[in-house]
A protein has these predicted regions:
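Catalytic cores of alpha/beta
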Residues: 94-96, 155-171, 196
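Conserved SAM/AdoMet-binding glycine-rich loop
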Residues: 37-145, 151-156
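Radical SAM enzyme core and accessory elements
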Residues: 213-279
């Protein structure tokens, strides 16, 4: 059993070019860490549950630091997972060690791309060196990882997409790390995303909604830079098949919480041995 909890509403970053979350959640709000810890304790006692899944779009690092310290201080024996944005501040001091000691066993990252030009175009505010160091620390600590990847972001070339795929498939230590998983999604332009307001900046034009999709919140469009829609579709189909042969995938976001149960089931035996082999 894995129960959902919420530490914050909306997204503290709110700058990603592809994201419509600010359109849905106008104001970002973060809860007091102490109140969230109390939720953990209440739910643990009421439902006899020790596994929790943060539903946040991106957990703020300062919140996590306070939350983890409080969990440890009060000796709350739980395991949890949640979604983070790659941040340099996460790598400061012993913050990742603190997360592990508080029960963090899997972190979900919106990597989107392992190409710096594409990340900059996405307005992610992420440097590849942060990705590398975060992944390395997670593997050493025994924190499993999940990566979201995007195929076909406007202006993206085939070679740039392959940078992301090869980052995973050429990294055997990452592939062998317990509980690692990834999902590749085809880019979808949604209403309210920053790209909608200035499509020319991302090399797209003629945004439209097909009549048969009149209730859709997404757009179809034409590209002027990078791959066209046919090339994107073909590449995407090839890559999801390729990834599916090598990487654990999950069909729905919230099934990622099941990864906690997998790790808990195996951690007494093979997990420790596999971590030793990765060192």
């Amino acid at each position: 059993r894995v129960l959902p909890v919420m530490g914050s509403r909306g997204c503290y970053w709110e700058k990603c070019a592809f994201c419509s979350i600010p359109f849905d959640h106008m104001n970002f709000h973060v809860r007091y860490a102490e109140n969230v810890v109390n939720d953990f304790k209440t739910l643990q006692k009421k439902y006899n549950c020790n596994h929790f899944f943060f539903t946040d779009e991106a957990l703020p690092i300062n919140f996590l630091r306070t939350f983890a310290a409080k969990i440890i201080e009060e000796k709350v024996d739980v395991q949890w997972t949640g979604e983070l944005k790659f941040e340099k501040s996460l790598l400061k001091d012993d913050r990742m060690d603190l997360l592990y000691k508080s029960g963090c066993r899997k972190l979900i990252f919106g990597l989107e791309s392992y190409n710096q030009r594409v990340l900059d175009s996405m307005k992610k505010g992420v440097e590849l060196s942060w990705v590398d160091e975060t992944a390395e620390r997670c593997m050493k600590l025994g924190i499993a990882m999940h990566f979201y990847l995007i195929c076909g972001f406007p202006t993206e070339t085939r070679e740039e997409v392959m940078d992301s795929i090869n980052f995973i498939l050429d990294n055997q230590r990452l592939l062998d790390s317990p509980g690692f998983s990834a999902i590749l999604s085809q880019f979808d332009l949604e209403r309210g995303a920053p790209i909608e307001k200035n499509p020319a900046e991302w090399g797209i034009k003629n945004l439209y909604t097909p009549p048969e999709h009149d209730l859709s919140l997404g757009y179809s469009y034409e590209t002027t830079i990078g791959m066209n829609s046919e090339e994107i579709n073909e590449l995407y189909q090839q890559l999801i098949e390729k990834l599916g042969r090598e990487v654990m995938t999950f069909p729905h976001n919230y099934s990622l919480s099941d990864g906690l149960l997998y790790l808990a089931h195996h951690q007494r035996n093979s997990l420790t041995e596999r971590l030793g082999a990765l060192a």
